[in-house]
Amino acid sequence: MPAPPPACPDVQLVFARGTGEPPGVGGIGQAYVDALRAQLGPKTLDVYPVNYPASSAFGDRIQFARTVIDGIRDAGMKVEATAANCPDTKVVLGGFSQGAVVAGFVTAAEIPEQIPPEYLEFIPKPMPDEIAEHVAAVVLIAMPSDRFMRDIGAPPVVIGPSYVEKTLKLCAPDDTICNGAPVGGPSFAHNVYGVNGMVGEGAAFVMQRL
């Protein structure tokens, strides 16, 4: 007899790691997972690390676009599959740094108009509107600012209308990646989310929406 399908979790976390981190959810992502598990209590949680390169090749716009597109496609497929196969499961979407860009773009209602026509065939289509009903919360940790994105030649992230009220953006005050500073290397503050209380804040935001 075939093995029975795995039980659907109460909560499905789809999380994209930050730039240059090894496969998995990354260090900040793991701190967020731990905070979420601590607050969920008896609820079951499954963690899906988004499968994408998380490339640090910011100077190569084509390569950077490819890594983000790979992440958007993989994360979107997991969210849609969960909605189809486990309709009662609450999906939580999130990411850190470059991973937050991936997660943010997954919510987009339309492909950014800044995308050159020759690249459109490679861009994943936005998720169907009804998928938003299955997504309880979106937590974006240290998402690069609009200024940062423009400076590297990428379109800024626009959260889809169906996700705006369920999205939390976390940015430490001195984090130059997300606070609107000109593009440059990350400041010390970019790596303190695991200890500055913000992952707990993100977990609490999720709990309010389950």
Language-model segments: residues:
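Active-site catalytic motif of lipid deacylating hydrolases and related acyltransferases
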Residues: 5-90, 170-199, 203
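The alpha/beta-hydrolase serine catalytic core
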Residues: 129-208
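Hydrophobic membrane-targeting and insertion signals
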Residues: 1-2
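Serine-dependent carboxylesterase/thioesterase catalytic core
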Residues: 73-161
